[in-house]
């Protein structure tokens, strides 16, 4: 499989990862271990990936793992087609912990909180990791494939 510059750099420096290929726009997707994510994130920022375009999370399969996905862009003055890379960090449902990248890209704030709220991934060292969409009293993670929808409906008075 063809590898991009980042994958080649990680191989050269003996950082365990897996290339997941390229999308239709030629953007490489890499799978990174959760324990390596904070140091790789710093490397990417130093290299010039100064913009976290988006972060999301999803449940891979019932009984399977959870994934946190980061789309990073290297924005430079005078460049019409900036470099991009996609990073996927997979964790098991029984201990879904990933280092937060809030301290590198501040735009990760609400995005990591939403991933925590909907999928249940805890982002270590996030300064305000709490629910952002659901009430604090909500039980469970609504976007997990094994989530059971509560069987209750609040009756509202029309007056």
Curated annotation (Swiss-Prot):
One of its GO terms (biological process) is photosynthesis, light reaction. GO terms for molecular function: NADH dehydrogenase (ubiquinone) activity; quinone binding. SUPFAM superfamilies: Nqo5-like. It catalyses: a plastoquinone + NADH + (n+1) H(+)(in) = a plastoquinol + NAD(+) + n H(+)(out); a plastoquinone + NADPH + (n+1) H(+)(in) = a plastoquinol + NADP(+) + n H(+)(out). Keywords: Chloroplast, Membrane, NAD, NADP, Plastid, Plastoquinone, Quinone, Thylakoid, Translocase, Transport. One of its GO terms (cellular component) is chloroplast thylakoid membrane. Its EC number is 7.1.1.-. Its main location: plastid. It comes from the Eukaryota. Transmembrane segments: none annotated. PROSITE patterns: COMPLEX1_30K. It is a peripheral membrane protein. It is found in: Plastid, Chloroplast thylakoid membrane. It holds the Pfam family Complex1_30kDa. NDH shuttles electrons from NAD(P)H:plastoquinone, via FMN and iron-sulfur (Fe-S) centers, to quinones in the photosynthetic chain and possibly in a chloroplast respiratory chain. The immediate electron acceptor for the enzyme in this species is believed to be plastoquinone. Couples the redox reaction to proton translocation, and thus conserves the redox energy in a proton gradient. NDH is composed of at least 16 different subunits, 5 of which are encoded in the nucleus. NCBIfam families: PRK12494.1 (NF009141). Belongs to the complex I 30 kDa subunit family. This is NAD(P)H-quinone oxidoreductase subunit J, chloroplastic. The gene is ndhJ.
